[in-house]
């Protein structure tokens, strides 16, 4: 079956092949629909998937440019990878796994699952994802390098009110967003160099009132952020010194 997606990615209409899968069997489900998985460009998945299915999408679906996982549930899994410098794929239930679309240069459009809780490290690292990113409500953590070195992300970044932690280092380093950077009030942790080298962010930088920890260089080289930075009373960890300042 086919389905049109009119609103989920920058209001760009996309026609998807819709595949209902069970975890670990996406490849077989595509074959059962009489489709060649190596030639599919726009894919919408329903049902359940796991790390092995992300391996198929990342490493074997060579034409894939748009993925819609809005109605899918992600199940825990692990797929070991030791080729071409790519990382292994792993995650728990309702987590977008580690490196699941790492260096997937052809991928330009992605719709997140409604039930997503965590975006694991390097999930989209150096992929071709473009335009805006709208992280869905329910996500509580975004990990190390998830959106690192992605200059084609030249739209807006929307973070959910449920977000508690942006952890590790370089999570949005070098992203090309052009928008105001609005941090959710419930955000408690910002890791090192999280927004390093993102000059497209503009407007007043406001740290959340519940922020407890901020890492070195978190906003370094975000030269178009301005305003009088107010340090929240909840902050217990802040780097010091000219080389470690968060901005």
Regions found by a protein language model. Name each.
Residues 52-60:
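A short acidic, amphipathic alpha-helical/loop segment
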Residues 17-39:
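Acidic Gly/Asp/Thr-rich repetitive segments characteristic of extracellular carbohydrate-active
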Residues 1-10:
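Short, exposed coil/turn segments at beta-strand boundaries within extracellular/luminal domains
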Residues 14-21, 41-49, 64-94, 105-118, ...:
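Structural signature of tandem-repeat unit edges
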Residues 99-100, 120-123, 143-148, 169-171, ...:
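Consensus positions within tandem repeat domains that build extended binding/scaffold surfaces
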């Amino acid at each position: 079956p086919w389905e049109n997606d009119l609103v989920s990615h920058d209001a760009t209409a996309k026609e998807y092949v819709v595949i209902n899968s069970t975890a670990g069997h996406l490849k077989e489900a595509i074959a059962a629909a009489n489709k060649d998985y190596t030639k599919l460009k726009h894919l919408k998945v329903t049902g359940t998937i796991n790390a092995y299915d992300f391996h198929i999408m990342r490493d074997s679906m060579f034409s894939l440019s748009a993925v819609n996982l809005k109605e899918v549930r992600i199940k825990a899994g692990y797929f070991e990878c030791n080729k071409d410098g790519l990382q292994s794929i792993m995650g728990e239930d309702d987590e977008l796994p580690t490196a699941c679309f790492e260096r997937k240069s052809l991928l330009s459009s992605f719709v997140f699952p409604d039930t997503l809780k965590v975006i694991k490290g390097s999930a989209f690292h150096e992929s071709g994802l473009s335009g805006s990113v709208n992280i869905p409500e329910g996500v509580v953590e975004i990990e190390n390098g998830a959106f690192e070195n992605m200059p084609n992300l030249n739209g807006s970044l929307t973070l959910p009110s449920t977000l508690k932690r942006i952890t590790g280092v370089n999570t949005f380093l070098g992203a090309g967003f052009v928008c105001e950077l609005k941090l959710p009030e419930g955000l408690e942790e910002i890791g090192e160099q999280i927004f390093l080298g993102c000059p497209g962010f503009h407007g007043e930088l406001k740290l959340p009132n519940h922020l407890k920890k901020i890492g070195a260089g978190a906003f370094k080289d975000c030269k178009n952020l301005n305003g009088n930075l107010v340090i929240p009373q909840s902050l217990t960890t802040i780097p010091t010194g000219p080389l470690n300042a968060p901005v």
